[in-house]
C-alpha cells in the first residue's frame, strides 16, 4: 500500500510539474499542437504490472489536465498527449524507445521504475540536447532512486521527484 501511495504521490507531482511550466496566457482561437509526453517503462515482462500502474495514473492525470483546457503556455493553452513506450525493463530497449519518442516529437520523457534505465536515458538525453538544441527534451524521473543520478551523473535535463536511496 505504501508503494502505491508513493507512486501515486510521484505521479501527482509529475502532473503538477507539467502545469507549472505554464505562463498565464489567453487561449487563441486556433488549436495549438499538444505537449508530447513519452512514458518509457517496462510494460511487458516481470514488472509489467508496475509499468501498467504508472500508465493508468498518468492517463488519469493527463485526462484531468486536458478536461481543464490543457496547460497554459506563452502561445496559449495546449493539451497533453501521453505516448507509452515499452522498454521491457531493458536499457537497450529504453534507448530504442527514447529515439522513437524523440522522433515522434516528445518534449518530456517520464521514467522511474529502473535506476539503470534512468542512467542510460539521462546520458542519451543530454547528448541529444547538445546535438539538437532546437529539439530539447526534459527527463522527468518519478522514482529511480540511485544517488548517482543526482550526484556524479547529475545533469541539467534530469528532474527527480523522489529522494535518493541514501536519504
Residues of each region from the PLM?
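Signal peptide-proximal N-terminal region
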Residues: 30-32, 56-82
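N-terminal secretory signal peptides that target proteins for export/translocation
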Residues: 1-9
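Extracytoplasmic "Venus flytrap"
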Residues: 32, 38-59, 86-91, 114
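Second-shell loop/turn segments in exported
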Residues: 43-50, 83-87, 106-108, 155-163
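Boundary at the C-terminal end of the N-terminal hydrophobic targeting segment
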Residues: 25-27
Amino acid at each position: 500500500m505504501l508503494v502505491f501511495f508513493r507512486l501515486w504521490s510521484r505521479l501527482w507531482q509529475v502532473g503538477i510539474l507539467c502545469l507549472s511550466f505554464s505562463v498565464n496566457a489567453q487561449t487563441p482561437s486556433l488549436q495549438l499542437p499538444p505537449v508530447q509526453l513519452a512514458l518509457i517503462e517496462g510494460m511487458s515482462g516481470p514488472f509489467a504490472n508496475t509499468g501498467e500502474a504508472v500508465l493508468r495514473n498518468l492517463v488519469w492525470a493527463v485526462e484531468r489536465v486536458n478536461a481543464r483546457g490543457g496547460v497554459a503556455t506563452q502561445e496559449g493553452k495546449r493539451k497533453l498527449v501521453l505516448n507509452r513506450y515499452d522498454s521491457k525493463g531493458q536499457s537497450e530497449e529504453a534507448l530504442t524507445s527514447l529515439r522513437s519518442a524523440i522522433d515522434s516529437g516528445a518534449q518530456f520523457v517520464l521514467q522511474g521504475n529502473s535506476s539503470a534505465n534512468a542512467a542510460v536515458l539521462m546520458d542519451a538525453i543530454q547528448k541529444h540536447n547538445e546535438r539538437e538544441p532546437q529539439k530539447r527534451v526534459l527527463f522527468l524521473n518519478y522514482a529511480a532512486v540511485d544517488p548517482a543520478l543526482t550526484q556524479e551523473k547529475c545533469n541539467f535535463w534530469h528532474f527527480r521527484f523522489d529522494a535518493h536511496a541514501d536519504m
